[in-house]
């Protein structure tokens, strides 16, 4: 009987394991740790063309020559909720920078409620297939992830995990001054 129960217990324990990853939802997406990566100008690679349908029903196309802060988010993500006010404040403090959200693994109803709750004024793409186009670069590897694309259209920085106002502002200034 003990061998039988042990035989049932082992597969149960293994099936419940996440392999040490931090699961943030049923799809077992990884939560970032807030580490920022800055790429020197000479080592940057071109970002893919950034365009697509937005949460408000419009279409977005990146403005050439503008620095872009691209934030990958979802309404169910608690670090996304924590960083939303800082992102909105920075978008107002830096009108010369284009802020853009990329909704991932979420419903449009929940996402619209999130945008309304946090009074997010910048657009959010609803087609997260754009994230696949960053393959081979500083790919968005967690939710949330924030990328900064320089005015030349190259990926300049990434924060994997929740951003803070001061950390993101410092990176924006570094990217702008390194143009």
Predicted regions and their residues:
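Active-site-proximal beta-strand/loop segments in catalytic clefts of secreted hydrolases
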Residues: 72-74, 102-105, 127-128, 160-162
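N-terminal targeting signals for export/organelle localization
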Residues: 1-49, 179
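A short beta-strand-turn-helix
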Residues: 42-68, 135
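Thiol/disulfide oxidoreductase modules built on the thioredoxin-like
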Residues: 116-121, 127-179
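Extracytoplasmic
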Residues: 45-47, 63-65, 97, 119, ...
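Short active-site neighborhood of thiol/selenol oxidoreductases, capturing the structured segment around
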Residues: 59-81, 87
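Structural microenvironment flanking redox-active thiols in thiol-disulfide oxidoreductases
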Residues: 81-119, 129-134
């Amino acid at each position: 009987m003990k061998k039988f129960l042990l035989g049932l217990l082992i597969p149960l324990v293994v099936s419940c394991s996440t392999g040490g990853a931090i699961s943030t939802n049923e799809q077992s997406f990884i939560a970032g740790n807030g580490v920022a990566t800055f790429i020197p100008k000479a080592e940057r690679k071109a970002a893919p063309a950034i365009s697509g349908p937005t949460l408000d029903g419009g279409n977005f196309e990146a403005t050439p020559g503008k620095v872009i802060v691209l934030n990958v988010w979802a309404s169910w993500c608690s670090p996304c909720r924590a960083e939303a006010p800082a992102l909105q404040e920075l978008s107002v403090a830096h009108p010369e920078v284009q802020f853009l959200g990329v909704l991932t693994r979420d419903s449009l109803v929940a996402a619209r409620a999130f945008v309304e709750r946090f009074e997010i004024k910048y657009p959010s793409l609803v087609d997260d297939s754009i994230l696949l186009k960053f393959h081979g670069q500083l790919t968005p590897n967690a939710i949330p992830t924030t990328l900064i694309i320089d005015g030349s259209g190259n990926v300049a920085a990434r924060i994997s995990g929740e951003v803070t106002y001061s950390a993101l502002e410092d990176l924006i200034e570094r990217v702008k001054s390194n143009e």
